[in-house]
């Protein structure tokens, strides 16, 4: 997101405690290695127009679920206070479409019911509520961005994730000529190429588009079997693609506002996989 937004000329101040992911060297990017939960804060940022709160802990041991939830809630509170201090005009809270998946549906949208299945989704739903209440009280425009199944082809577990995405596991297995596995061939998922997230977000910013809640997902939803066949170097066969279970849990999300968003050039999976393979061959 940092790399993508900076390419549009935005002046970016990025804060993180470790920066385990690659940030481009760019005159528009200033990296601040800080912890939002720390009592000591630098004064390197005087003010900003937009605050994007993307920080969240996703990993936890079974006995640390409560602390994960509390830490994420505290991160959100600190981010909101900082946004107020910096006189931000707009606050984006990055949430997840995982908040929908308690209920069995073919597809989910912004009007679907939400439920906290685990400490992570609980922290997201509480964070959404806190952000809404704080921003409304302090007259800060806000948007809750629920991000879906994003992929880029080069994910690393060290990027604070418990596991890589299903897409990345298939890509990794295919490179090693291993069997591609899924719970059900007909599981339907939304797939958003990671490069599209900053493009869509930039479009929202420069066009001053405002949504209280927005599923920031591409309009492309595919069944697992379609993606597996596209990734595979071989033709579909029982020896190559293995069905583990028969139960299907669809988690495809779409946005009811997709036609109102000015950004239209969402990357198809075929184009994305070609970009990934071209990059690998460099």
Residue ranges and their predicted role:
Residues 1-50:
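N-terminal Rossmann/SDR dinucleotide-binding element
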Residues 36-71:
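NAD(P)H-binding glycine-rich loop region in Rossmannoid oxidoreductase-like domains
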Residues 50-51, 63-92, 130:
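NAD(P)-cofactor binding segment of oxidoreductase domains
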Residues 69, 112, 117-128, 160-168, ...:
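Short-chain dehydrogenase/reductase
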Residues 78-119:
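Conserved Rossmann-fold NAD(P)-dependent oxidoreductase catalytic core, especially the SDR/UDP-sugar
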Residues 102, 115-143:
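Active-site Tyr-X1-5-Lys
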Residues 132-188, 194:
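NAD(P)-dependent short-chain dehydrogenase/reductase
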Residues 175-282:
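C-terminal substrate-binding subdomain of Rossmann-fold SDR/epimerase-dehydratase oxidoreductases
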């Amino acid at each position: 997101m940092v790399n993508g937004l900076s390419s549009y000329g935005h002046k970016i101040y990025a804060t993180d405690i470790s920066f385990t992911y690659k940030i481009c060297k760019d005159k528009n990017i200033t990296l601040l290695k800080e912890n939002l939960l720390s009592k000591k804060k630098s004064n390197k940022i005087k003010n900003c127009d937009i605050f994007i709160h993307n920080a969240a802990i996703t990993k936890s041991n079974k006995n640390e679920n409560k602390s994960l939830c509390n830490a994420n809630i505290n991160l959100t509170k600190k981010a909101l206070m900082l946004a107020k201090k910096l006189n931000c005009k707009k606050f984006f809270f990055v949430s997840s479409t995982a908040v929908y998946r308690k209920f069995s549906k073919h597809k989910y949208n912004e009007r679907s019911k939400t439920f906290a299945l685990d400490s992570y989704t609980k922290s997201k739903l509480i964070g959404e509520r806190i952000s809404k209440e704080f921003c409304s009280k302090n007259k800060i425009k806000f948007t809750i961005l629920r991000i879906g199944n994003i992929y880029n082809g080069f994910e690393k577990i060290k990027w604070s994730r418990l596991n890589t995405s299903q897409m990345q596991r298939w890509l990794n297995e295919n490179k090693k000529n291993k069997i591609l596995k899924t719970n059900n061939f007909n599981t339907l998922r939304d797939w958003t190429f990671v490069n599209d997230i900053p493009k869509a977000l930039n479009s929202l910013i420069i066009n001053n588009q405002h949504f209280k809640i927005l599923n920031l997902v591409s309009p492309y939803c595919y069944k697992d079997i379609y993606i597996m066949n596209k990734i595979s170097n071989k033709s579909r066969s029982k020896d190559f693609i293995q069905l583990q279970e028969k139960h299907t849990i669809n988690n495809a999300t779409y946005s009811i506002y997709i036609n109102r968003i000015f950004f239209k050039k969402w990357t198809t999976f075929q184009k994305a996989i070609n970009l990934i393979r071209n990059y690998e061959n460099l």
